[in-house]
Amino acid sequence: EAGEECDCGSPANPCCDAATCKLRPGAQCAEGLCCDQCRFIKKGKICRRARGDNPDDRCTGQSADCPRNRFH
């Protein structure tokens, strides 16, 4: 939702302050296929295996999201 950096629904998430819905100090992310222990996974790590003619999807190192890498 607007103003939230992370989903504050679960107080058990070590990356997110449940009271403020903001990332804890030093955290880059709270969840996502390219987020591990509150940090972005390094560039090039496979986050989703290839299907059909599409190549493996890989983390960018700049986001917790796993981008879709598709042939055009």
UniProtKB/Swiss-Prot annotation:
It holds the Pfam family Disintegrin. InterPro entries: Disintegrin_CS (IPR018358), Disintegrin_dom (IPR001762), Disintegrin_dom_sf (IPR036436). GO terms for molecular function: toxin activity. Keywords: Cell adhesion impairing toxin, Disulfide bond, Hemostasis impairing toxin, Platelet aggregation inhibiting toxin, Secreted, Toxin. Disulfide bonds join C6-C21, C8-C16, C15-C38, C29-C35, C34-C59, C47-C66. Residues 1-72 form the Disintegrin domain. Transmembrane segments: none annotated. SUPFAM superfamilies: Blood coagulation inhibitor (disintegrin) (SSF57552). Expressed by the venom gland. A motif (Cell attachment site) lies at residues 51-53. SMART domains: DISIN. Residues 51-72 are annotated as: Disordered. GO terms for cellular component: extracellular region; plasma membrane. The keyword Secreted applies. The disintegrin belongs to the medium disintegrin subfamily. Monomer (disintegrin). Belongs to the venom metalloproteinase (M12B) family. P-II subfamily. P-IIa sub-subfamily. Inhibits fibrinogen interaction with platelet. Acts by binding to alpha-IIb/beta-3 (ITGA2B/ITGB3) on the platelet surface and inhibits aggregation induced by ADP, thrombin, platelet-activating factor and collagen. This is Disintegrin cereberin. It comes from Crotalus cerberus.
